[in-house]
Amino acid sequence: VDSVLKEAENLIGNGVKEILLISQDTTYYGRDLSDERATLPELLRGLDKVGGDFWVRVLYTHPAHWSDELVEALAESKRAVKYVDMPLQHIDDWVLSKMRRETTEKKIRELLKKIRAGIPSVAVRTAFIAGFPGETPARFDRLMAFIEEAKFERLGIFSYSKEEGTQAYSMPGHVSARVKQSRFERAMELQQRIAAEVQRSRIGMRLRVLWDAPGVGRTEWDAPGVDGRVYGRGLEKAGTFSVATIEGSTDYDLIAKGGAIPKEDF
C-alpha cells in the first residue's frame, strides 16, 4: 500500500488529476501479499488522505471478488469516483460456468443490487461476449433480456474470438461468424438506445467535469478512452476541474452550456 500511495503522491505532485487503479482483477489486490493492510478498501482509504485535487478510478473489478467492505469504501471515499467497472461476460449460468467466471446469475443480480443501493448515483460499466461456444439462441435471448432490464450506464459488447490454446477453442457448439455478427449488432443496438436514455436523463444537471483538453472533458461516470465525453465552450483549461450545466446530449456524449460537438467528432 505504501509504495502505491507514494507513486500516487508523485503523480499528483506532477499535475496528474486522475489516478487509475487497474489490474487483471483489481478486486483481488493484496490477497497474494503478507501485508494485511494491502486490500483495495484500505488503499482507497489511504488515497483519501493524499493531498491535492484529483479523482481515483477503479477499473477491471471481478464480480466474484467483491465484498461489502469494498462497496462501503467506494461509497464513503471522497476521492473515488462513483463508477464501477465490472466485466460480467454473460448472464446465463451455463455460459458463465464454461467461461469459469466463478459466479452465477443469482450472485450477479444480488451484487448489482447491493452496489446500486450502497453507492448512490453510481454508474456501472460492464462488458459481454456474444457468440461464445454453446451460446444457443435461448441463451443469447437471456443475455439480451438482462441488458434490457439492468440498464447499464456503460456497456461494451465483443464477439467471441477463437484463440488457439484456450479451453474454449476446442469446445463444441461454435457459433458461425454470421450469427456472432448478428448478435453483436443486436446487442449494440439495444445498448445504444439505453445509453441515449441515460444521457438524456443528465440534461439539466450541474456536473463536475475533468477537462482533458479545451472543450473536451469527462464526468466521474466516464473513464478515459472508452466512455463518453462532455463538450464545453473550448475555453476550459486542460487538466482542470469545473462544474458544467448540461444542456444537451447525444447517444453517448453530453453537451455543456455554450458547448458544441466539433465537426471532426461527428
Residue ranges: model-predicted function:
Residues 170-266:
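Terminal RNA-binding accessory module
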Residues 118, 138, 142-181, 187:
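C-terminal, non-catalytic macromolecule-binding modules
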Residues 4, 40, 108, 140-143, ...:
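Aromatic/hydrophobic pocket-lining residues that form the small-molecule binding cavity
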Residues 4, 21, 58, 86, ...:
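Conserved, mostly hydrophobic/aromatic
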Residues 12-138, 148:
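Conserved SAM/AdoMet-binding glycine-rich loop
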